[in-house]
Amino acid sequence: MKNRLTSLSSLVLILMGLSACQSVPPVAPPATDPASEAAAEPVITEQAQAPAPAVAEVPIPPESLLPLLHAEFLLRDRDLDAALEILTAEALRLDDPALTRRALRLAEFRQDDARALALAIKLSEQDSSDAAAAVTAMGLLIRAGEPEEALVFARTAKARGARINAPALLVSWDALEPDKRRAVATAVEALASDWPADQDIAIAVAYLRRAQEDPDRALAALEPVLSANPDEERALLLWSQIKLDSGAKRPFEKIRDAVARNPDNEALRLQFARLLASASELDEAREQFAALLTLSPRNGDYLFSLALIEIEANEPEAAKVNLQALLDLGQRPDEAQYYLGRVYENLEEYGAAIEAYDKVGPSREFFDATRRAAELRLDSGDTLDFRDGFRRTRARNPGQAEQLYGIEAELLREIDETELAIQVYTEALDLFPESMSLRYGRAMAHEALDDIPGMEGDLRAILKLEPNNATTLNALGYTLTVHTTRYQEAATLIERALELSPGEPAILDSLGWVYFKLGRLLQAVDLLKEAYALFPDAEVAAHLGEALWVSGREQDALVVWRASLEREPEAEHVTDTLLRLGVTLDTSVID
């Protein structure tokens, strides 16, 4: 019985919200996610929060009276989107800050970012004292992936006395083109120059310099922040991450000291625990999560994180205790049952593992739990129990029946029960006749049994429902190429697939191979070379090598085949081709 409990390091990071490879905010783990902060309520100073100065009442133009009155009635009738459309149009047309402010509040409430951005920009221009409007425009531009424009409003907001979430300005750094990066970097450094005491901006500068692979200057940007506030979470986490990046001996010293100074600060301790887990410091991470549970004994997130760490640390009995405690709390039941199943499977308690997996309901873990339970039943040799297990699962979860049929059939194919798999697909298609995935799966099962008419029938049924399905066009064309002599028909299908998915290596390979069959050798070689450059798979290598060989380019063919066998010595596509052509790799070719 094979051990299916693989390392959970990456899983721990994902489930705990960490990312070990990001170079800009959020770092692993961020004290506050810059992207979500950008969408949150603006953080502004008391000056910015103060009521806006009284302004003269703006008379309503006669042509706006009826639209605005209509908007009022729509608001009373709770037709908010229609009201927003009218209010936005009037606010952008008129010069009335009060109207713009009202429309902006409604746009934010309706989460209409496009209108909210236009209104925030308008309000910032209309009212030179409105810091919140500038902060809102900045946040919405960040969310839209426009940091250069956001920086303009960041500067405006600062000038009006607002506090800004400066690190969020770098959240899209990795996606920026080089010239955009230079512009953003210059603007962020300029903010720091103009507001040298601003801790948020200093942290943004540190993020920037880390992204620029300048760790010493990044740490230098953090030093004044930590000198003024040794417990600043974002600065502590970023400092630790930079130290980790550089392989420093004591990367956690500052945050560890801060936790010691603030033993009841759950947020700080949690970030420290997550940071330790991301660095695979599992023993200390476990201690920190245990301390968090002392502070909040009914916190299911802490229990779950602790259990994952115990699984990773090969402490299955401790993990079982904490996962059961999580179930007793009634929190995260599907995740708890799934990982209980993983633990039992690792302990070779397969009956208990199946029982736990069967209790996982619709969730992120559901389909993997179902697959694992089914594999364990198959490993026991009980095909009847395997099928009954799927019937019971479908009865409990009718909304997932289509996918469950697909998993059942796939697993049967994996153990060469292809005829039984076709029965499952057929039963499923009676219930879901328009399911592309089920019909495609049955087509592949027909091919495995050399039932080419059956395969062709299913693929053509898919194309009847979806004539521009490039995958199916390619599959049918390649099938006709390999199993029939209907090469021109096959070429037409594959050419259409390539029009729909240009540059797709599998389709390039198929088209090159059918052109080879048609005797169009120059075109075949060009297409197969392109496919091989994109995807140096053994099957593509076999095709390209044969096309080169038949074209008289024997030496080039040998180079391709040798390279493929060096990567995969048992590659059947290549070895079968060599055998069929009577070629050995030590063949001497005389030019």
What residue spans do the PLM features occupy?
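Alpha-solenoid helical repeat scaffolds
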Residues: 55-76, 83-591
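Post-signal peptide N-terminal segment of mature Sec-exported envelope proteins
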Residues: 27-62
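Bacterial signal peptide processing site
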Residues: 22-25
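C-terminal motif of bacterial Sec signal peptides marking the signal peptidase cleavage site
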Residues: 17-20
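Bacterial N-terminal signal peptides that target proteins for export
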Residues: 1-10
